[in-house]
Amino acid sequence: IARVLGCKRTVEGGLEGERYVVTWALGHLVELAPPEDYDKAWQKWDMLTLPMLPERMKTVVIPQSGRQFRAVQAQLRRGDVGELVIATDAGREGELVARWILEKAGWKGPARRLWISSQTDKAIREGFTHLRPAAEYDNLFRSARARSEADWLVGLNVTRALTCRHNAQLSAGRVQTPTLALIVEREEAI
């Protein structure tokens, strides 16, 4: 994208051209806060602390991603940046990656969305001629956030309950639990 947009000058955490500054996320830079960020009692794995039901879910910068988050945030805070183009993967997770970064970085300016399924020069150029208001993707972001919050609530609560109840390191999750059930079912059939 940076090459197609003519961004060649290196800046902190990005590349700059005459019209655009391109930066990147390298996957998730922000995630839902761990249990102990809501309540210190939730740091201990104990049946008495379950269920863990935060009144409002919070996000935190992933510690290993802090440097890149700060680089993105620095680009967003530049005085010459008046609009943002979200160019993460076209899909639910890509929307979540971008929106959580923007929320955590405090971006309040206008935003548009690049929605492309190919990284060819032609696709990128065409995509930039058809940018849509980011608000048109709000429901996609909401669905991604709901999925992430549900995974946190079910995964952490059920994992802790199983581990505490059976005194063994066990885990449960939205995808892994039914997948394991299918494997067990298949194994029993053999």
Residue ranges of predicted features:
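Intrinsically disordered, low-complexity regulatory segments
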Residues: 1-145
